[in-house]
C-alpha cells in the first residue's frame, strides 16, 4: 500500500446530522493523494454508525473508548496516520474542493513551514470570516484573526499567520516529529494555541493559505457562549501562558488579565461581546465563580505543565525578543477580546 501525501482527520463527537457533510467534503477534494480518518470520541448519537454506513471502506473509522477531548482524540488519529502532512477538519466544518491542495502547496513552498492556516468562513454567512489564523493577547487568550469581518480579501495578501485554528489546519509530519503532538490535558480549547506556539518557539513557521477555504459552524459542539466553553478557555489560557510564554511576560501578565477581566465584566453588565451573551444565559456572579474554578483547575495542572515546559526547553530556537516580535505582529487588543463576540 502506497503512503499518501496527506492524512485528513475528522474528530467526531455526537456529530449526527452534520459530520457526514464534513467527511464527504474531504472525499470530494481535487487533491486525491489523501487518506481520510475519522476518530469517534465515543459518540452516543449513532453518528459513528452513520459514518460507517455512508462511507464504508473509503474512510478509516477509529473508535476511542471514551470522549478523549480534542487533543487526545486527534493524537489518536495522528499516531496511526500514514501521510507526511496531517490535515485537521472539525466535524462541524466543510472544506471547499481546493482546501487540501492549497494547504499542501503552502506547506511545501518552504521547508521551514510547519503549520498552515486556512481561511475559515462562517457556514451560515459565507462572506463572514471565522478565522485566518489566530491573534494572541499578552495573558495567553487568543481569538481568530478577522473574526466576524466581511471577507473582502483583506487577509489574502498575508503570507503568514501566528498559528492555525485546529478547526481547519495542516501540520507537517516533520514539525510534529520535532516538537510532539497536542497537549492532552487541555481537553477542550487552547490545544491548538499551545501546539502552535510550541512550534513557533521551536523555529517553525506558519503560512496562511487564503484559497484553502472551509466553512465552519462556530462552536457547534459545545455552544458558542456556553459556560463549559468559558471555563476551558480561561483555564487553558493560563496553562498556555505558563507552558509557552517568556518568564518576563508571565510576570507582567496579571496586569493584562486584570484589564481584560474588567472590560469583560463591563461587557457582561452592558450586554456587549461574548461576556454579554454569556451573562444573558447566567448571572455575573456565576461567571465570577466559574472564573475562580477555572483558576483553581489551572493551578492543579501547573506541575504537569511546568514539567513539560522544562522538557521542551532544549527545542526552543527563538528568544524572548523574537517571541515579543511575533506577539506584536499578531496581538489581540483587550477591547476586542472583551467586546467582540
Range-by-range predicted roles:
Residues 128-129, 138-143, 149-174, 193-194, ...:
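A recurrent flexible, glycine/aromatic-enriched loop bordering the glycosyltransferase active site
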Residues 86:
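Short aromatic/hydrophobic "clamp" motif used to bind/position activated sugar donors
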Residues 14, 26, 41-46, 54, ...:
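Conserved short acidic donor-positioning loop in nucleotide-sugar-dependent glycosyltransferases
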Residues 94-137, 141:
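Conserved donor NDP-sugar-binding/catalytic core segment of glycosyltransferases
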Residues 162-213:
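A short, conserved alpha-helix in the catalytic core of glycosyltransferases
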Residues 24-33:
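Short, acidic, metal-binding catalytic loop of nucleotide-sugar glycosyltransferases
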Residues 202, 206-307, 321-324, 329:
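Active-site-adjacent helix/loop segment of glycosyltransferases
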Residues 64-81, 91, 102:
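Glycine-rich, basic loop-to-helix element that forms the pyrophosphate-binding segment
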Amino acid at each position: 500500500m502506497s503512503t499518501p501525501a496527506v492524512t485528513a482527520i475528522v474528530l467526531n463527537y455526537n456529530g449526527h446530522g452534520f459530520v457526514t457533510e464534513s467527511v464527504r467534503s474531504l472525499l470530494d477534494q481535487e487533491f486525491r493523494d489523501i487518506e481520510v480518518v475519522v476518530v469517534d470520541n465515543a459518540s452516543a448519537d449513532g453518528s459513528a454508525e452513520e459514518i460507517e454506513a455512508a462511507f464504508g471502506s473509503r474512510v478509516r473509522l477509529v473508535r476511542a473508548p471514551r470522549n478523549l477531548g480534542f487533543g487526545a482524540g486527534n493524537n489518536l488519529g495522528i499516531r496511526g496516520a500514514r501521510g507526511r502532512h496531517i490535515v485537521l477538519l472539525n466535524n462541524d466544518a466543510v472544506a471547499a474542493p481546493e482546501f487540501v491542495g492549497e494547504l499542501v502547496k503552502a506547506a511545501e513552498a518552504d521547508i521551514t513551514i510547519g503549520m498552515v492556516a486556512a481561511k475559515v468562513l462562517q457556514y451560515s454567512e459565507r462572506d463572514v470570516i471565522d478565522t485566518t489564523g489566530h491573534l494572541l493577547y499578552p495573558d495567553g487568550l487568543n481569538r481568530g484573526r478577522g473574526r466576524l469581518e466581511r471577507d473582502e480579501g483583506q487577509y489574502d495578501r498575508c503570507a503568514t499567520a501566528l498559528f492555525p485554528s485546529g478547526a481547519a489546519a495542516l501540520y507537517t509530519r516533520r514539525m510534529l516529529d520535532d516538537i510532539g503532538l497536542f497537549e492532552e490535558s487541555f481537553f477542550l480549547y487552547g490545544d491548538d494555541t499551545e501546539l502552535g506556539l510550541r512550534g513557533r518557539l521551536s523555529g517553525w513557521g506558519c503560512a496562511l493559505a487564503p484559497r484553502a477555504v472551509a466553512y465552519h459552524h462556530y462552536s457547534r459542539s459545545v455552544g458558542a457562549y456556553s459556560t463549559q466553553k468559558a471555563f476551558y478557555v480561561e483555564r487553558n489560557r493560563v496553562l498556555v501562558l505558563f507552558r509557552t510564554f517568556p518568564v518576563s511576560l508571565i510576570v507582567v501578565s496579571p496586569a493584562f488579565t486584570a484589564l481584560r477581566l474588567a472590560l469583560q465584566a463591563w461587557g457582561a453588565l452592558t450586554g456587549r461581546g461574548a461576556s454579554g451573551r454569556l451573562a444573558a444565559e447566567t448571572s455575573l456572579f456565576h461567571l465570577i465563580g466559574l472564573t475562580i474554578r477555572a483558576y483553581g483547575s489551572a493551578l492543579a495542572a501547573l506541575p504537569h505543565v511546568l514539567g513539560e515546559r522544562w522538557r521542551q526547553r532544549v527545542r526552543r530556537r527563538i528568544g524572548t525578543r523574537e517571541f515579543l516580535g511575533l506577539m506584536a505582529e499578531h496581538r489581540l487588543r483587550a477591547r476586542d477580546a472583551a467586546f467582540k463576540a
